[in-house]
A protein has these predicted regions:
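Helix-loop junctions and terminal segments of transmembrane helices
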Residues: 71-89, 154, 273, 277-315, ...
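Interhelical loop/hinge segments that connect adjacent transmembrane helices in multipass membrane
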Residues: 3-18, 187-191, 204-251, 294-309, ...
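Membrane-interface junctions at transmembrane-helix termini in multi-pass inner-membrane proteins
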Residues: 80-89, 141-167, 181, 188, ...
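Transmembrane helical elements of multi-pass membrane transporters/channels
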Residues: 25-40, 168, 172, 190-213, ...
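Interfacial segments at transmembrane-helix termini and the short loops linking adjacent helices
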Residues: 53, 116-135, 305, 309-312, ...
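Membrane-water interface segments that mark the loop-to-transmembrane alpha-helix transition
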Residues: 5, 20-37, 62, 67-117, ...
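Hydrophobic alpha-helical transmembrane segments
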Residues: 129-136, 162-215, 386-391, 405-428, ...
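Signature of the first transmembrane helix
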Residues: 2-11, 18-76, 100-118, 169-173, ...
Length: 466
């Protein structure tokens, strides 16, 4: 046993030392996301005392507008950057995406100027005021960052990207805290910090190497080649972009529904609860996703028979990793939020309880979601995401119709968990894995963990009362 353990450790160390290996790339990316997550969690108690739920709600509305417009403006071509084997086709994809971003900037400037007031009234976000005019610029910078992020992923420059992520987080959080401290928590502090973070990321990625290749983008410019790659990767605007948009919309539905049904304060509570749930997800998932997408694509092209096993191994590891932490936040979320962030945010802790175990399967899905793209089965991803949107809309509408915020969010969390679980099982089925066995094991483990933690909570409550 000791010999086997030693061999396992030595093999792991060897993989970490191997330049360009999956283990080394993951370790580098993980270190960057870990630093960002730790920073985010460390400043959260301060942020909640500088900015109230209403400021967080308006900030969530602004970001929802930016992310939705951004997805449409590039037609979803950026994720295809990994696929071309010839550099000329890759550069043509970059040119296409940048051209779409520039065109969108002009159209947005006109549209947002004409429809500012009706949009703000519909979203009940009049307090954004002049910040609404910043949306086109924020979308443009966001799009360029997406392009450069995909470029770094193609070149496997994970170390440089990890450093950029840390610098961006420090810059954005520092400005947000400073403005909040001086201005008593206006929504402008959150918006200014976020915009500064986007600009910091843009400058850092551009001048960390890509600026030397800008001439290469201009020189081989050809409308014929651009139209050719646009058609070759047409499944991205037809399937990937709608899927990404629906996925984005699925996460933002509470922002729009709760704004109209319960006000921006409720939106702020939801936005803050999900921002903390996203921290561990970003810590693990965002470290895994880019590296694993590159690895899965490479494996399918060279050794397709190995794809099934590497997906299953990663799925199991992520599932086990998230089981207990998200279980704790599910059962003890209201206590944790009240103690750390204050009584004003206790309801946000209740929301995390409704969503906690959905995030277990979201974390595990980082091992399955790339499979649709790798197998070129994006239409199935679109169906799954559309189903997620439908069940979430139904859940929130029921909460609004009954004037019961807690009921709406509880159904939102349960329906999200069910659909995500079914999509994961569908992907494992496509890989010809024993789905029924895997599904039964997952259900038993989740049920046992919840029973144990709820029993512990009842025990603590009993002793506190006594």
């Amino acid at each position: 046993m000791y010999k086997r353990l030693r061999q396992t450790i030595e093999a792991s160390i060897g993989q970490l030392r191997q330049k360009g290996s999956f283990a080394q790339n993951f370790a580098i990316t993980f270190s960057g996301t870990a630093a960002v997550a730790v920073l985010g969690f460390a400043v959260s108690p301060i942020m909640t005392r500088l900015y109230g739920p209403q400021s967080y709600g308006l900030f969530a509305v602004f970001n929802a507008i930016v992310s939705n417009v951004s997805l449409f403006s590039t037609l979803g071509y950026a994720p295809a950057f990994l696929l071309p084997r010839r550099r000329s086709r890759f550069l043509a994809l970059v040119q296409l995406t940048v051209l779409l971003s520039v065109a969108a900037l002009g159209l947005m400037g006109l549209a947002f100027g004409l429809f500012q007031e009706p949009l703000l009234r519909w979203l009940k976000a009049e307090a954004l005021g002049g910040w609404f005019y910043v949306v086109p610029f924020a979308v443009f910078i966001f799009n360029l960052n997406v392009v450069m992020s995909a470029w770094y992923l193609r070149t496997k420059d994970f170390k440089k990207r990890a450093g950029i992520d840390v610098a961006t987080a420090v810059a954005g959080r520092s400005l947000t805290l400073g403005v909040g401290w001086l201005g008593n928590g206006p929504v402008g502090g959150l918006l200014l910090g976020d915009l500064f973070a986007k600009l910091t990321m843009f400058g850092s990625m551009l001048f960390s190497g890509i600026h030397r290749q800008l001439g290469e983008i201009r020189r081989p410019f050809s409308w014929v080649r651009i139209k050719a790659v646009a058609w070759q990767y047409r499944e991205y605007p037809f399937y990937v972009m709608p899927t990404a948009y629906l996925s984005n919309l699925a996460g933002q539905l509470p922002i729009f529904f709760l704004t109209t049904g319960f006000g921006t304060g409720a939106v702020g509570l939801y936005a803050f609860s999900t921002s903390l749930l996203e921290l561990p997800l970003n810590l693990i998932g965002n470290a895994v996703a880019p590296v694993f997408l590159q690895k899965a694509t490479e494996t399918y092209q060279q050794e397709p028979e190995r794809l099934r096993q590497i997906c299953l191994d990663l799925y199991n590891r992520l599932f086990y990793l998230g089981l207990l932490p998200f279980g704790v936040i599910t059962v003890f979320g209201d206590w944790i939020f009240r103690f750390i962030f204050g009584a004003e945010w206790e309801q946000a802790g209740v929301f995390t309880g409704y969503l906690g175990y959905y995030y277990v399967f979201r974390l595990a899905s980082y091992a399955t979601s790339p499979v649709y793209a790798v197998l070129r089965r994006q239409q199935l991803a679109l169906v799954g995401t559309a189903l997620l949107v439908l069940v979430r809309v139904a859940s929130l509408l029921l909460g609004i119709r009954t004037h019961n915020l807690n009921l709406g969010m509880l159904l939102f969390g349960l329906s999200s968990l069910l659909v995500t679980f079914l999509v994961d099982m569908n992907i494992l089925y496509l890989l010809k894995l024993p789905v029924l066995k895997l599904a039964a094991r997952s259900i038993v483990l989740v049920g046992a963990t919840l029973a144990l933690l709820w029993g512990l909570r009842r025990l603590v409550e009993h002793f506190l009362v006594v």
